[in-house]
């Protein structure tokens, strides 16, 4: 809905190939944007660069009435691969975005995890870096069914309210869910939860490092780990009761030595005991 508020139907939103809005929303962004499209920007470790963004921007919006016009840029942090945009990287993306007269959206489903990992403030990671709107996550950090939309332009914020109502996202008694956001933000609870999740991930990373049968696919920078390991190791872990997603192949059949990628996520409630239990399974 934020993107729909920022995008005209004949425009295109610039995002990375693995962006949630491209891979995991059942075409909802295109639907709510009235048919606007997504243009994929080349990424490294799930992050676009100023250079790759500029290239994508130059390839769109130059065909007059025959092609899509340039629309907002959308980035995600923590990214879908567990990496983080530094403040300098956000500012650099914003500079290119503003050079083309466009708006910058930040998908912050794990905003808190990225912020505490950087040691930044909410303002430093948003409007001070040139971000125009933030999808501020709650459900990935302890809330139940609650997210917040933070829009720094009052005119766009009012349009968002209308779009929320029209999209049936303003429903009766929702205040009983929305009330969580007050408690979430009060006294820094949201940052405490994120620090706990990141710290637990650090313990898990330390336990995985040094094994010659495991390699990190991406540098773990917050609370998500992608690790590459032989199929046989995944089979042993899952068979012993570990629960996690395995990507890029069938874990149940194939070469035991074939390398598959596992995805591990630590939340605010993860305990050292649970991590030790997983590492014990790993040790056999």
Region spans (language model):
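Conserved PLP-enzyme active-site core in the AAT-like
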Residues: 1-240, 248-270, 274-284
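FAD-binding core/adjacent interface of flavoenzyme oxidoreductases
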Residues: 244
């Amino acid at each position: 809905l934020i993107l729909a508020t920022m995008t005209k139907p004949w425009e295109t939103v610039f995002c990375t190939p693995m962006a949630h809005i491209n891979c995991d929303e059942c075409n909802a962004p295109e639907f709510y944007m009235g048919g606007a499209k997504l243009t994929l920007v080349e990424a490294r470790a799930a992050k676009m660069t100023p250079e790759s963004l500029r290239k994508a921007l130059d390839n769109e919006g130059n065909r007059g009435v025959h092609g899509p016009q340039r629309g907002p840029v959308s980035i995600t942090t923590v990214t879908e691969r567990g990496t983080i945009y530094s403040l300098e990287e956000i500012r650099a993306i914003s500079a290119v975005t503003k050079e083309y007269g466009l708006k910058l959206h930040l998908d912050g489903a794990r905003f808190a995890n990225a912020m505490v990992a950087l040691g930044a403030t909410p303002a430093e990671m948003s409007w001070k870096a040139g971000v125009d709107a933030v999808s501020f996550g709650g459900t990935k950090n302890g809330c139940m069914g609650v997210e917040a939309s933070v829009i720094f332009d009052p005119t766009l914020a009012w349009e968002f309210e209308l779009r929320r109502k029209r999209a049936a996202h303003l429903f009766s008694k929702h205040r009983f869910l929305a009330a969580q956001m007050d408690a979430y933000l009060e006294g820094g609870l949201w940052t405490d939860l994120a620090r706990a999740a990141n710290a637990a991930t650090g313990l898990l990373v330390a336990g995985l490092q040094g094994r010659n049968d495991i390699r990190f696919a991406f540098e773990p920078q917050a609370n998500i780990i992608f690790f590459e390991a032989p199929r046989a190791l995944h089979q042993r872990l899952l068979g012993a009761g570990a629960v996690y997603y395995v990507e890029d192949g069938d874990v149940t059949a194939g070469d035991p030595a074939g390398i598959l990628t596992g995805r591990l996520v630590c939340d605010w409630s993860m305990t050292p005991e649970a991590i030790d239990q997983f590492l014990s399974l790993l040790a056999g």
